[in-house]
Regions:
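Extended, low-hydrophobicity, polar/charged segments
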Residues: 1-165
Length: 165
């Protein structure tokens, strides 16, 4: 049996081009089936405090064009009111799962804040500021990337705010 090198994801190529150091973590999964964030933390042996999930929302001011990305700890929930305030919107709502690929280029369970089709305004929950490294989707189910949060936030021109309950 031949083993081929794992193809790099768009997120990994962008990090490589920017010369950002990162570590990959893989976990077993059934092809195409998303795994919830707490299980991803368990399967990769990572502390859930530093494992983050990527959520995509639309703003009320222009629902067909104003999309916002929020990256939060897997054990927390996004507070939509705080999230809206962080991006200067009256309100935001989660996009439908069916829309994820068309908007981001990624699939549910494999949505990375790095390397989306278009770079949307991205906000990390403020807890990330206390971490040396943060773990987030590498752009496909079964792959996580660990890197310094400051490097990722700078790369994607992101921000931090209190956006969780």
């Amino acid at each position: 049996m031949k083993y081929m090198a794992e193809a790099k994801t768009n997120a990994m190529r962008i990090l490589d081009r920017a010369k950002i150091k990162y570590e990959m973590h893989t976990y077993p999964h059934t092809e195409g089936e998303a795994v919830d964030g707490m299980n991803v933390a368990k399967l990769t042996g990572q502390d859930p405090v530093k494992v983050y999930k990527t959520l995509v929302t639309r703003g009320a001011s222009n629902p067909s064009k104003n999309f916002y990305v929020f990256v939060i700890p897997v054990a927390k929930e996004l507070d939509l009111k705080k999230a809206a305030k962080a991006v200067g919107e009256k309100s935001v709502e989660m996009i439908h799962v069916k829309e994820i690929n068309g908007i981001t280029g990624y699939i549910r369970g494999g949505c990375s804040p790095v390397g989306m089709k278009k770079q949307f305004k991205t906000t990390f929950h403020e807890d990330v500021n206390a971490l040396d490294t943060v773990v987030f989707s590498g752009g496909k189910i079964g792959l996580q990337i660990e890197a310094a949060p400051a490097d990722i936030i700078k790369l994607i021109n992101g921000q931090t705010a209190d956006i969780c309950y």
